[in-house]
Amino acid sequence: MLQSWEFVLLISCFLCFSSDALQRISLKKMPSIRETLQEMGMKVADVLPSLKHRFSYLDEGLHNKTASTILTNFRDTQYYGEISIGTPAQIFKVVFDTGSSNLWVPSHQCSPLYSACVSHNRYDSSESSTYKPKGTKITLTYGQGYIEGFLSQDIVRVADIPITQFFTEAIALPSIPFMYAHFDGVLGMGYPKQAIGGVIPVFDNIMSEKVLSENVFSVYYSRHSESNTGGEIILGGSDPSHYTGDFHYVSTSREGYWHVDLKGVSIENKIALCHDGCTATIDTGTSFISGPASSISVLMETIGATLSRGDYVIDCNQINLLPDISFHLGDMTYSLSSSTYVLKYSDETECTVAFSAIDIPPPRGPLWLLGATFIKQYYIEFDRQNNRIGFATSF
């Protein structure tokens, strides 16, 4: 028979787990690939002439044993969180990417000829007692480069949730751009429809464990640039301390993707682009806001930005004179001030505008990608339960 103190302890532990509700993943902010190149005095276009952009998944062949994906902006993001794989735990820094659905990390079997593998944490299946081989070949392509690997199964722990997960061990990882990346791999937070090789995505496996109070996850990026703490991802809900007001929800516009209808893009409250509507995706895997080349060209010309070595730039002294740029989603308008969408690197007099051009052909495009530049201003809730995305103003 339980003693009274044992009963109280048992109930307390149960309540601790069942207020489950929120499982938190701390995000660290580090220099993006773009910023790393900038610090070295290089531009993206200098080292990646054929790699201006990527876009995720092809609609055909996703469930074949060997399938491919095209990466957008080569995961040029600043925000990474930690997960573990295997028993005992092997730790990896990953990008939580709403634009894809697979988990991949470098493999211990990756040849030392690939310097990008050597410079990152690598998964060693021989060190894990819970590893199970699968072997299915996986290829992820971007521009003229590629990542090659094979599927394995092991225990993956995200926040405090352990799941049995198929993931890709990358054995061919190109030096450019991954040599400049501060993350080890990518954890896709997209829908199963986007998954390469028919793999069940990590978040779907977490949902099947029924440990979350709601089948949602939220993404918060801190606005405080001086802090190394980049924000957090919350599984199972959202944290009111990260936002003000209420969430406003927009239903996803395409089954199986985090796409929403974009009713217009305006400059100083005047609709300038997407008069007849466009499609946008909220992309946690990229830093900039991207759109069709013709639209971005008009937008940049309107604010006086010019193209220089692959990036749009403007005189830093003009930042305070630039107009707000707004995105119309659902019944709401989400505005970005110039201090948000213009980036200043070190002591340069020329500043980078955080917009880039990307032409995605039909049927997947044309498409706007709202990356970290947008997410820093607005706390985002991705709701799998109701197939919708919520937006609230971040603190």
Swiss-Prot record:
Listed under GO biological process in this entry are: angiotensin maturation; negative regulation of renal sodium excretion; positive regulation of artery smooth muscle contraction; positive regulation of blood pressure; positive regulation of vasoconstriction; proteolysis
- Described function: Renin is a highly specific endopeptidase, whose only known function is to generate angiotensin I from angiotensinogen in the plasma, initiating a cascade of reactions that produce an elevation of blood pressure and increased sodium retention by the kidney. This protein is also found in snake venom and shown to specifically cleave human and porcine angiotensinogen into angiotensin I. It does not have general protease activity, no cleavage of alpha or beta casein. May be directly responsible for elevation of blood pressure in the victims of envenomation.
Tissue expression notes: Expressed by the venom gland (at protein level).
MF annotations from Gene Ontology: aspartic-type endopeptidase activity
* Residues bearing glycans: 64
For the keyword RNA-binding, the answer is no
Output the Pfam families linked to this UniProt entry: A1_Propeptide, Asp
Q: Where in the cell is it found?
A: Secreted
**UniProtKB keywords:** Aspartyl protease, Disulfide bond, Glycoprotein, Hydrolase, Protease, Secreted, Signal, Zymogen
Q: Where is the active site?
A: 97, 283
Q: EC number(s) on record?
A: 3.4.23.15
So what family is this one in? Belongs to the peptidase A1 family.
Q: Which residues form the propeptide?
A: 22-43
Give the protein's recorded name.
Answer: Renin
Upper taxonomic lineage: Eukaryota, Metazoa, Chordata, Craniata, Vertebrata
Q: Name one GO cellular component term.
A: extracellular space
Tell me the disulfide pairings in this chain.
110-117, 274-278, 316-351
Q: Which CDD domains match?
A: renin_like (cd05487)
Protein origin, superkingdom: Eukaryota
Q: Where is the signal peptide?
A: 1-21
- Please state how the activity of this protein is regulated: Inhibited completely by aspartyl protease inhibitor pepstatin A, but not by the serine- or metalloproteinase inhibitors PMSF or EDTA.
Instruction: Please report the stretch or stretches of sequence annotated as the Peptidase A1 domain.
Output: 79-392
PTM comment for this protein? N-glycosylated.
Species name for this entry? Answer: Echis ocellatus (Ocellated saw-scaled viper)
